[in-house]
Amino acid sequence: MEELNQWKHELSRRRARRKIDSFYPDSGPLRRELYPKHLEFFRAGAQHRERLFLAANRIGKSEGVGAYETALHLTGQYPNWWQGRRFTCGISAWAAGKDSKTTREILQLKLLGNIGDFGTGMIPGDSILHTSPKPGVPEAIESVVVRHIAGNKSRLVFKSYDQGRESFQGTEQHIVWLDEECTRDIYIECLTRTMTTNGLMLMTFTPLLGMTDIVRDFLGITPNEL
């Protein structure tokens, strides 16, 4: 009996460190056919560099869309049904939120898991090679090195809008995931970082600020049409 309990505990532990495998299954109450908008967003990545998942609160934007796709690209562990963009080797990526606190409590949590239990988020535990703490922000991570199935490594850096546009200058990126709406100047700066790599821009947010320039651009609405 003790051996059986140990086996069950180990199985549970391994499943917790492969959270990504539980999303969008073929069948069951959470089968992927129930999420047509999510799948449409993923497919669009094969043709479009810039995408926005604009939706209400509490429908899985951050975890089921942003964190899920970002983790796939970082690891190269695409499911068989994936019809979106694929990267065949390690990448450089940013994930950014409104401020350091929300970045830690949302993006870091969704991708890595709880403090002291990294590997229980969307990035599989055995794919996380190294994490670097963020100076001056308790329990926050600045960067993560991730194993890619091609045999090399990906690197993810957590950033926040309150660092200002200048902090988004410099290095080229393959993926930039912006969770919550940023200012237009930050968006343009991030888009510039992906140009030489033909990289992807992902945005996930609820339009709490109304019909902003960014929302209008994605919806194809001109100011005269408002």
Segments from the language model and where they lie:
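Phosphate/NTP-binding elements of NTP-utilizing enzymes
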Residues: M1-L226
